[in-house]
């Protein structure tokens, strides 16, 4: 479980008046209510958007290991645009780069990569140590092509079917 901190900032843009951005994740349970104001300044407000449950699955260990081995391991926060007064909601958080990429591909979700907090990293490392089995990579080889497979057959050759033709004279 992590708490997600988002920021609402006014921007000078011809088509948008503001921007939402995930700025921090707080490891562990959060005691404050969703959308509690954490801080504000001129043109910006930070909220605790809510809590997000992190789940790990043994079948996805390869992507978790990839995330942990990257130069900057990340946790991905997914925000979704809505039609309500706030205009955005917390959809969740993930440590799976593939899942984050899938959300980014939809076009409706805002995905932010944030630094992976230490306790979450340790939890992931322990999970990967238990469940990760490195798969051997092998290159698939094609069957050798039979150059005679499409050849024209003559009588007496293997594969030639002798048909009885009768002349109609």
Enumerate the language-model features and the residues they cover.
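Amphipathic alpha-helical interface segments used for dimerization/assembly
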Residues: 120-132
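Terminal targeting/leader modules
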Residues: 1-116, 133-169
